[in-house]
């Protein structure tokens, strides 16, 4: 029962956050380093979420909130928010590191239930960035039973000169 209440509380907080300009969402950036040179060449954008209770900020683990975003469909607007923040940051970083790349996690739900292509292309166009500056990290588990779909997806990425990698490969 406690687990049920916790999930409902988080879902409610997620709905409110999305409705209120993504208040409580943050994007953290994990550097990607070139091992030979020791220089930063990019970053992975990581979605984080904190809910507010009694005016106190309570961080919520991605292990808890990501499945709830997917379950409710809120992963689509939240993912769009992270994508736009990440591409904006990539634009800023390319002033200092000209070949800087940004990796963005894309949920299986985003791929099959939203127009993620339009979102990606619109975002990189808005900041006048080349497609190869963005790498979509697709969680392998969502595609395990979708081999024909996955091949179409790969072809679409290649046609748009977009990179993708399988995230959490081998974890099922």
Where are these regions (language model features)?
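Active-site core of bacterial EAL-family cyclic-dinucleotide phosphodiesterase domains
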Residues: 2, 6-68, 105, 166
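Residues at alpha-helix caps and immediate loop-helix transition turns in enzyme cores, especially N-
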Residues: 6, 41, 61, 115-117, ...
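Helix C-cap/alpha-to-beta connector motif
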Residues: 21, 56, 81-106, 122-133, ...
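Structural preference for beta-strand elements that scaffold enzyme active sites
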Residues: 26, 42-44, 99-103, 133-137, ...
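Sensor-regulatory modules in signal-transduction proteins
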Residues: 32-34, 51, 93, 111-113, ...
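Structural preference for long, well-ordered alpha-helical segments in enzyme cores
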Residues: 64, 68-69, 82-90, 119-120, ...
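Catalytic-site/binding-pocket detector for metal-dependent nucleotidyl cyclases
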Residues: 73-74
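The catalytic core of metal-dependent phosphodiesterases that act on cyclic dinucleotides
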Residues: 122-172
């Amino acid at each position: 029962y406690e687990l049920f209440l916790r999930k409902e509380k988080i879902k409610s907080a997620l709905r409110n956050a999305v409705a209120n300009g993504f208040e409580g969402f943050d994007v953290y950036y994990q550097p990607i380093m070139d091992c030979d040179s020791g220089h930063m060449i990019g970053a992975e954008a990581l979605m984080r979420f904190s809910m507010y209770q009694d005016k106190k900020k309570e961080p919520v683990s991605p292990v808890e909130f990501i499945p709830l975003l997917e379950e409710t469909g809120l992963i689509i607007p939240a993912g769009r928010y992270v994508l736009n923040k990440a591409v904006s940051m990539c634009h800023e970083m390319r002033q200092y590191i000209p070949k800087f790349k940004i990796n963005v996690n894309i949920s299986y739900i985003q791929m099959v239930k939203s127009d993620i292509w339009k979102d990606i292309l619109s975002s990189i166009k808005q900041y006048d960035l080349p497609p190869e500056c963005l790498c979509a990290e697709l969680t392998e588990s969502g595609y395990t039973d979708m081999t024909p779909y996955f091949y179409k997806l790969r072809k679409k990425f290649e046609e748009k000169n977009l990179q993708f990698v399988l995230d959490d490969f081998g974890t099922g």
